[in-house]
Amino acid sequence: ENSLENKNYNLTRKILKNFKEEDEIYYWYKLKKMYQIIYNEEGTDQALNYIEAKFNKYTNPSIKILYDMANIYQNSKKFDESIKYYSKILQKINKNSETYADVLYKRGSSYERLGDNENSDKDLLKSLSIKPNDPYVLNYLGYGWLERGYKIKDAIDMLDKAYNQRQNDPFIIDSVGWGYFLIGDYVNAEIFLRKAIQLMPGDPIINDHYGDVLWKLNRKMQAKYYWQSSFNSKETEEELKKKIKIKLLKGLDKV
């Protein structure tokens, strides 16, 4: 682990050679670490080609391996593929278990990224019926509803419930702040979004949100600073960059 974190990939490869194919758990661990090395050295496509070729050799992969592959596809923005494997897992596990709720959450988030709000809501609400206080599902669903302008009061209630459990989670704090922004309470929005950006200063979405609320509070030079930070981030998706570019040139009201 340390050699991988320190980017000493040659040492990591030497260590991983000791993991034999006969031991499925440790061998799969080796394959995942090799996937990470290839991802860091050569990029997403080459890493996916590697792990897919290895995964396809398994005739009866364990639930753990299926879950890892589903997550790899989700992190690679191959959401259709991730849904396929999350669905396979759901067919194999107890429908009342916390694990079932967790996988529903993951599948629901993939549906949401595809714009399939109907199936996303269905999975997330089902997950909450099993684990009604899960702060991350409450946050994800509440934030999604706010973005869609759907059931605003219920969405804010969910975010408050999540925040009461995770008061130092920057993503949950950002969601609460954004909720205040969307209902026009810019003073409270600024308080929460400022706290979120202090905890996660490099996150492009939090920077963008904080820029928006500063603009509404007529702190326009500061707003442009945070928009620019978001625009410059390597993690910022192209669609968001397009919106930020307009904001930097013409202001928030033109988006």
Cite the ranges covered by each PLM segment:
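Residue-level recognition of tetratricopeptide repeat
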Residues: 1, 35-36, 71, 109, ...
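Register position in tetratricopeptide repeats
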Residues: 5, 40, 75, 106, ...
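TPR alpha-solenoid repeat register
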Residues: 26-30, 65, 99, 103, ...
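Canonical tetratricopeptide repeat
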Residues: 33, 68, 106, 140, ...
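Terminal, low-structured helical/coil segments at or just beyond the last alpha-helical repeat
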Residues: 209, 216-255
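Short coil turns that delineate tetratricopeptide repeat
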Residues: 24-25, 59-60, 94, 98, ...
